[in-house]
Amino acid sequence: MKEIEKLQVGAYYRMDDAEIAEIQNKAIALCQKIDTVSILDHSIREQLFRKLFGSVGKNPSIKPGFRCDLGVNIHIGDNFLTNYNVMILDMATVTIGDNVWI
């Protein structure tokens, strides 16, 4: 079983796995890119959220400073909002429902 598969089923896995590191690096780069896009440019920011997260509902709003482990394990519902400097550790699945503000 590959390390990423172990991670996905909640089993012990090696943090130094190249595939996991690649996903983490992509998440870091996307979080940095999101921070460079104006908070007023909703469409571009939403496109980036959709690249970062496993699934995204309607009308997501994430203030600057957002960070996560992998991104792909985060699933957010409609009307999701985070305030500044939020970190979600998603080495396991994180599901956030509709109308949630953090």
PLM features: residue spans?
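Terminal amphipathic alpha-helical/low-complexity segments used for targeting or macromolecular assembly
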Residues: 1-59
